[in-house]
Amino acid sequence: MSEDLRPSGDITTALIKNNKKIKAKIISNQNCVIGGLSFAKEAFKYSDKKINFKTKTKDGKKIKKGKVVAVVCGKAKAILKSERVALNFLSLISGVATITKKFVDKVKGKSCKICCTRKTSPNLRSIQKYGVKLGGGLNHRFNLSDEILIKDNHIAVDGNIKEIVRHAVKNKKGKKITVEVDNLNQFKKIMGLKFDRVLFDNMNIKNLKRGV
């Protein structure tokens, strides 16, 4: 909210003379998995604690285009001041949840899991990863301390994939180890070492099948 209200508040809404009580509906403009209702509520409450935010569905539910997601009642100025932040939360989290659900549905019935990465927007990781969970996906590591992930850049700096994996095994301290490989030759070098997972990076389908 501070992004919108600094330094001088909502100077456009301030022009409205009649600060009457209004009722607004939040309506889905497409089929989606809804997410972010509690965040939207807090955005409105930040503007005015007296605003009533009544949900018509729950996070994680699949809804149809045209569905009323929530009804907001309160003073007009307070609602106008916070509507965009509330909708941004709903749009972002619902968008992540919806696209995740599409991937989850594609692998339904197979021994596959859809996981997310750390490639998130700064300061929004928890929110975006929450969207992944709503869509049925799984969260990979949240930060650099959660798991050892030996990537191509680590290998490029160290120069010896086998040695860096061995070093990781000796110093893992209960953490899981994932190793990224760019080709099958790299994979062969670390076969037999006690790491937990391998990440096949940008491989074609033929080599990916061979690797699996």
Regions found by a protein language model. Name each.
Residues 1-193, 197, 209-210:
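Acidic/glycine-rich phosphate/pyrophosphate-binding loops and surrounding catalytic core
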Residues 202:
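Short secondary-structure boundary segments
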